[in-house]
Amino acid sequence: MSSGIKEYNELIKTIVNDMVEQKKNENRIIDESESESESESENNVYQDVIPESKTQTQDNRVSFTETKYTEMKTLDNGFLQKYDVKLYGSDKDNYDIINDFLQENQSEEAFYIIDLGEIVKSYNNWIRLMPDVKPFYAVKCNPNPVILEALSELGVNFDCASEKEIRNIIDITNDPSRIIFANPIKMSSKIRFARSNDVDILVFDSEYELFKIKLFHPNAKLILRLAVDDSHSICRFNCKFGSKLNEVEELLTIAKTLRLNIIGFSFHVGSGCLSPEPFYNALADCRQATDIAIKLGFDISIIDIGGGFPGVDKKIRFEDIANRVNDGIRDFFNEENSNKKIQFIAEPGRYFAQKTHTLVINVIGKKVVYDEERNEKINVYYLNEGTYGSFNCIQNDHYEPTLLPFNEQKETCFRSKIFGQSCDSIDVIANDILLPELAIGESLYVENFGSYTLSASSANFNGFTPTSKFKYIFKDQVQN
């Protein structure tokens, strides 16, 4: 099968190139007096290569499942009861809540406290600051099924990158129209899977992906991912994904020749973006790409502004990014936004997930070593979590977690080193940290730990499985 696909791809590419060149040559020898319009001829070089596909002019609009999107929302009591969610008022801080669960849980196992109220607050903040952009939650960030269902209840749609993620969302929503298959590179079998499950919105960034889509999902609604400036981001993606602006016309021409349906453009400024300007500049690129698409006869109905939104307003505020996105929509797509010709969507992950999780861990081992150069002791602690579990984010997401002792006292702090529970010497959570003296069995906690932690952890290294105990709460919200 793979050999046949390769041969077919090469054949299609050869045919496309030959037909395009042939059409260009024909246009060159046409006498100007016989041409109705020179500019019209230039704009339609590829129009007659293959007869116009009906799908390019019909059934091109994307209608996502309607929700009361501009209305502030919360989760109803039925949902909270379904998952035995414990309610807390705003007078309770993390210490009080952790203490409640420690009293109930005498196990040595690590556990997460997940505040679903943070999801509601984030959602309402989004629609207040960026009402013209519909969020499609990036499932890869945290695929916890309760979080996914909570987001679905609020009307959030979903960005999926794999068959498993698609299956999970269909199981929860029973509505494949709420999914964008946003991975630009997909196995042929996964494209077939998307087609058989009515997942029609696919992202691509190369002609080879177009060839696969032509074979296995020819009626898909396609979004071309652009490579944009991601130099202000902690995790940069455009070295791997995205087509440059000067490649757009060629790719769209191939799509038109193959009778594929282009409906929009997407971009990703990188995860952990520290400046709002890349969003604005990328929207300017989308404007140029949209103009090229219109010239070729495509009806553009989606602009996907990707992810990169902060979960915690620490190094940059979400509001600053939202304001700049709104500026870009106004400056480059004001008419299309006003008449709802184009739907703007985004792929937030950590924005929704990061603040929801607090990880509670404890000390399972300890020893004291001496730094002869500095003539001082170093306390070495071993915890019941590590970099093969939730703390993988230290390497994979460039995250620097803050470990807080639960029994915090105003006492002398000592240089400390913290290891995870595996047998690997690189399982280091903190190399040099100041902590008070801790005893075996004492608890620590990490706040804002819900993004790219469990989702990227190793499944079973050394036989240690990822943390699987979750305590759900709902804090600081008025219930229906």
Please identify what each model-predicted range represents.
Residues 97, 101-103, 324, 330, ...:
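Charged (often Lys/Glu-rich) extended helix/loop segments that serve as interaction or gating elements
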Residues 226-228, 474:
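Non-catalytic surface loops within mature trypsin-like serine protease
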Residues 119, 140, 162, 194, ...:
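Conserved, mostly hydrophobic/aromatic
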Residues 134-136, 157, 178-180, 201, ...:
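Structural preference for beta-strand elements that scaffold enzyme active sites
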Residues 61-72, 228-367, 435, 461-464:
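Active-site loop/helix belt of alpha/beta enzymes
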Residues 113-120, 145, 160-163, 188, ...:
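Electropositive phosphate-/nucleotide-binding environments in soluble metabolic enzymes
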Residues 2-202, 207-220, 255-257, 261, ...:
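A charged N-terminal "starter" segment
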